[in-house]
Amino acid sequence: MSASLSEQYEEKVRPCIDLIDSLRALGVEKDLALPAIAVIGDQSSGKSSVLEALSGVALPRGSGIVTRCPLELKMKRSREEDFWHGKIKYKKDHDEDYEEEIQNPADVEKKIREAQDHMAGVGVGISDELISLEVTSADVPDLTLIDLPGIARVAVKGQPENIGEQIKRLIKKFITKQETINLVVVPSNVDIATTEALKMAQEVDPNGERTLGILTKPDLVDKGTEETVVSIIHNEIIYLTKGYMIVRCRGQKEIMDRVSLHEATEKEKDFFKDHPHFSTLYEEGMATIPNLAEKLTLELVHHIELSLPRLEEQIDIKLADSQAELDRYGSGPPTEPAERICFLIDKVTAFTQDTINLTTGEELKNIQHLNIFSSLRRQFALWKMHLDDSGETFKSRIEKEVNEYEEKYRGRELPGFINYKTFEVIVKDQIKQLEEPAIRRLKEISDLIRKGFIQLAQNSFLGFPNLLKMAKTKIECIKQVKESEAETMLRTQFKMELIIYTQDSMYSDTLSTLKVKEEEGERQKVGILPNSYSISCSLYNHSNNRATLEELMRHLKSYYSIASKRLADQLPLVIRYLLLQESAAQLQREMLQLMQDKNAIDHLLKEDHDIGNKRNNLQSRQKRLMEARNYLVKF
């Protein structure tokens, strides 16, 4: 690492990277994306060689898929010369963290293979569970990378047919995040435009703002194509905001000849310094592993600094969401008998108070967006609309029947007399037609109220299936009883409506108002003066029986207007009294009676296993987010 990097970043490089590593170790990545550098490349792109050169340790090699799990490679620079320490960590049995110290760098490859076999199974399968490898040495940069499986084009023996798609899904899971810098490894001796790794990076980062290209194997470039490689590194072929670097790592022959990583670094330096085409890249700081390490460290630190404000904001949002969910699930039942009784009393009391508040339109405690009165108003308005429509139909019918009156209704009375019996028959017939629609409306509203009560119970007793079942049973029973009482009351009301009665003054006022209205309508229709209209109309009407029939029509319309107003109010009043007020009061009495049976308390407070797990997970999330926020505050 250069002296300039040591001088300028010694105090903040490691703290920045340690901060993100600590957050990742807490498991915060389950909740939100953290700044990272993800390494991707096609199979045999030289990706493993680059990581080996950076970390100073041998990683799994071979043909086919070698990296079978995401590998978090945490490199920590030690000030002690000749110091080396390794540590591997991953999820083992029952989702528990397994951690093992590594004393010898030669054991790293073996330990990674063991971890991969445990996570992805022995063979060639893959897993998206992370393996964390920490390497502390004087020869490594302060840097954390995430190595992803190489992109496979064709399945080999033992691999599932869709292995290529599986790997791409895994890679996209990491590189899609805006917080990730994508390190794309491409061999220098292939057409860069055709590489799958760069295509995938361009799909998620079309402007190349968070993609850095690494060219490998420059010693295998065909003669005559060197200047094309130089143009790529100079960002003249496919533009990437973060640019390109070029490195030369150990080849297979050098590995077999046991060329050390230190020797390979010296060979790389000599290769670029002496190369007729690539020496300019070395002079510009665009070549060799040490320069790559410095660039990656600076990029990661800069990326972390830019991400911190958004990270703090996301943590606060996630904490608020977690607290809201925890409030919804509650604290869970206590273990002490006396406390369990109090817990049950509080639960039931809160629920019954909410049912009463629901029926009176007050604010609810256990659920925010439940207002039954908005639905009731719509239903009551529909009932009023039905009465009005029925009235209009009634008016049309009696106007049509006027001409049939002589044959259908007239008895022995002389012209000019209204037969009261006829009036009663027509009115009663119309009112009877309203009874069954009223009962149907009652049942619809009763079911709507029942659903509201059950929704309230589900929110109040979340995670307590026995308590919820008991509440649902009582809601259903009370609904049936109160609905039956309401139906009886309504049918009684309709029987009373068959008694033709209203206050004289009320009837006279309604009749007079209707008469004035009709006369005004007739005057406007014929366009004559009021006096001449009255005389001509009177002479005409008394010349036949028309006056009698029109008078009957007026009486029928007036009385229906009064009766329909009574019914428009009566149905809502019956519903609000019996199905709301009385039902809530009865439910409160019956739910509070549950506390009398001390033996039933344990049964009622038996918690749903999934809810308990969700609460524990939320508490764990809240704990790690709180710790994460503390890390950020102290940073």
From Swiss-Prot:
InterPro entries: Dynamin, Dynamin_GTPase, Dynamin_GTPase_CS, Dynamin_N, Dynamin_stalk, G_DYNAMIN_dom, GED, GED_dom. Residues 66-68 are annotated as: G2 motif. Induction: By interferons. The keyword Phosphoprotein does not apply. Pfam families: Dynamin_M, Dynamin_N, GED. Residues 41-48 are annotated as: G1 motif. Belongs to the TRAFAC class dynamin-like GTPase superfamily. Dynamin/Fzo/YdjA family. This is Interferon-induced GTP-binding protein Mx1. It comes from Ictalurus punctatus (Channel catfish).
